[in-house]
Amino acid sequence: MPPGCSFLNFTASHDGIGVRPLEGWLPQHDIDALVELMHRFGGYASMRTRDDGEDAPYELNITWFDAMKGNRRGPDAWQTPRFLCSQQLMLGLRGIPAIYLHVLTGTLNDLEGVERSGRLRSINRRRWQRNELEWLLETPATPTREVFKSLTRMLDARRQEPCFHPDAPQRVLDTPPSLIALQRGPTAEGRRLIAVHNVTDRPQPLELQELAHGQWHDLLAQAPWNHEATLAPYRSLWLVSEGSG
C-alpha cells in the first residue's frame, strides 16, 4: 500500500453485494447455494451473461441485515448477533470503515420498493419516514434500536483507539475455522489490540496464545477482561494491552 493510501472497508452499499470476487476462491456449488439462500431470505440475484452464454450472478440484492437472517440450514434466532459480529469484524480491519445508512438502522428488505421501481437494487434503498424511524429507534427491543445503539458504541470506541489508525499494522492470527482473530498494532508506544470473533452459532473455546499473558482490557465493556474461556455464539471482543509484545 503506497504511503498516504488506505483500504476502504464496507459490507454493504446502495448497490448489491458483489459476488464476483468469490469466483476462483469458492467452488461454484457454494456460490450457487449462497444465491439460493439469499432467495430464501427474501432477496434476489442480479445476473450477467458469461462468455459461454450461461447466466451467472454478479451481485446479491438484499439488505445486509436480512442477509444475516440465518445460515444454510435456514432462518434462526441469531440474526442480530450475527449481523453485529459481521460489522465488528469489518470495523477491526486495517483501513477506513464505511457504514451504509441501512446497515446502521438494521433495515429489512424493501420489497414494496422493488415493485414500485422495477429495480432489484431498490430492495436496499428504503426511504425512511422520519416518524417511523424515530419510533423504531426509541422503542425498546426493536432490532433497529439494538443495532443502532450497538454500532454507535462500536464506532465511539473505535474512534478513540490508537490501534485502529489506518496505518497501524495488522496480523491475522492462527485460529480454528470457527474463530477469526487479528492483531492491530503494536503502536509506537507498544499498545496492541486483539480482535476475536466467534463466527458460528455455538459457543467456542477461546484459546489464543497471544492472550495467554499480560493484562487485557475489554474496549467495549470498558473493563478489565476476565480471561473468559468460552466465546458465546457470534460474540466479538476487542481486547487491548498496554505492554510491549
Feature annotation, model-predicted:
Residues 1-213, 220-244:
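Active-site and adjacent substrate-binding regions of carbohydrate-active enzymes
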